[in-house]
Amino acid sequence: MTRTGLLGSPARASAVGIASGAALVAAVFLPWYQGNLGAPTVPGGRSGWESTTVAKGVFVLALVALVAALVIAADVADVVPLERRTAESLAWLLVASSIVAGILIGYRLARPPGPAEFLSRDIGLFLGVAAAVGGAVAGLAQLARRE
């Protein structure tokens, strides 16, 4: 008997995991910071990839989360049947990579690169935090399904 977890059905939890991983990858390339001085003085927003090396770490973690979510989804759809321990390990990998990515993004949200007094936060940071939370919740939902 399949239990419904945090996100309802296992397929829904898998879809949230995949969407969160993809959004986390995309967030790295969206603007993270915008200059406060105006367009004539400062060019448009800077993506996380351009702004900080932390974003490159987030990118790697996002790829790990996305691959884990895709393999879990293949297991849920019975395309690639996994052993219970393997599926649980992948779910924990999704949770851990999402949490660490969220912490890294949160750090850059709280402490932008210098000179920070001329920067405002942009959409990429906020999308990244939301995607990291979504990935962690999706991983936890997969773990709850397996109990």
Predicted regions and their residues:
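Compact integral membrane and secretory-pathway proteins
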Residues: 1-147
